[in-house]
Amino acid sequence: MIRLGVNIDHVATLRNARGGTFPDPVAAAELAIASGADGITAHLREDRRHIRDADMPRLRALSAPLNFEMAATDEMVRIACDLRPHACCLVPEKRQEVTTEGGLDIVGQSEALKPKIARLRDAGIRVSLFIDPEARQIETAAALGAPVVELHTGAYALGGSEELERLRSAAGTVAACGLELHAGHGLTYDNVGAIADLTGLAELNIGHFLIGQAIFDGLGPVVRKMKSLINS
């Protein structure tokens, strides 16, 4: 069965638009878990534009595993090692971007990433790397000791059969390298099926669509439907 990680960042975006504490992303996470989510994903960005530091321990205390998305900075590594979530996913981060625009270039940053990955693993945290579906990136992830890669599906979500073929090829490389395969970004009811069919896929992390669709259908029904679709 493919696991569904629900990203609750944009509940925090809505909260922060007015200040205060409502809507509470932790309450949304609890509802997602009760509705079948296998885990919760939260991205504590350097600019704190949605998730706040105070949210993270509360999310860590929930019954489902927490996947802490983070930039590969000394500050975030320290926070993660103190928090000790189930998993950390290292992602690229630019202050001017609206959302994560591509995968982490681990080939170009391998020397800087190696000690950070080692420190997180020494803290008992499962490390994943959010990367584009390229063989060199996947092979470098394996060489760096990361047990998981999350393939960036954003280009596929924008359309194009060529992108799906890249993802299929990448899934084969992930398997050949002995890594666990995750995927995410831009996935919806309409496009998730082909990604769920990738060979060896263990987990999907989906956020923006689920929170947006929940405005119309409610978060519980949306999570249940997505969980059903990815395992049908």
Curated annotation (Swiss-Prot):
GO biological process: pyridoxine biosynthetic process
Binding, 1-deoxy-D-xylulose 5-phosphate: D9, H10, R45, H50, T99
Gene Ontology molecular function terms on file: pyridoxine 5'-phosphate synthase activity
Cellular component GO terms held in the UniProt record: cytosol
EC number of this enzyme: 2.6.99.2
Pfam families in the cross-refs: PdxJ
InterPro entries found in the cross-reference section: Aldolase_TIM, PyrdxlP_synth_PdxJ, Pyridoxine-5'_phos_synth
Residues annotated as the enzyme's active site: H43, E69, H185
Reactions that this protein is recorded to catalyse: 3-amino-2-oxopropyl phosphate + 1-deoxy-D-xylulose 5-phosphate = pyridoxine 5'-phosphate + phosphate + 2 H2O + H(+)
Binding locations of 3-amino-2-oxopropyl phosphate: N7, R18, G186, G207, H208
Localisation: Cytoplasm
Keywords: Cytoplasm, Pyridoxine biosynthesis, Transferase
Gene3D superfamilies named in the record: Aldolase class I
Pathway entry: Cofactor biosynthesis; pyridoxine 5'-phosphate biosynthesis; pyridoxine 5'-phosphate from D-erythrose 4-phosphate: step 5/5
Site (Transition state stabilizer) residue list: E150
Quaternary structure annotation from Swiss-Prot or TrEMBL: Homooctamer; tetramer of dimers.
Family membership noted in the UniProt record: Belongs to the PNP synthase family.
Task performed by this protein: Catalyzes the complicated ring closure reaction between the two acyclic compounds 1-deoxy-D-xylulose-5-phosphate (DXP) and 3-amino-2-oxopropyl phosphate (1-amino-acetone-3-phosphate or AAP) to form pyridoxine 5'-phosphate (PNP) and inorganic phosphate.
Protein name: Pyridoxine 5'-phosphate synthase
